[in-house]
């Protein structure tokens, strides 16, 4: 089954987080755990947004300005939104 490692995305400028369904069946090292998404700290227009199984294991060089929590495969309403991106996974 695919393993989802993270998301690369361009952050938008809207102040609310749209609902994002990553996958119906997400498998990986911590499927039952709460995940976090890290935003680059430089403000609107940032191009890096990374989602990881481990809330503390963000991509090197990204300063985490805020966190949005989601459980399982659904992202909850939160602090930042309006992004396009793609899921990084392996087969």
Can you say where each PLM-predicted feature lies in the sequence?
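Beta-rich globular "head" domains
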Residues: 1-26, 84-88
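Exposed aromatic-hydrophobic patches
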Residues: 46-55
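Surface-exposed loop/edge segments in extracytoplasmic proteins
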Residues: 28-38
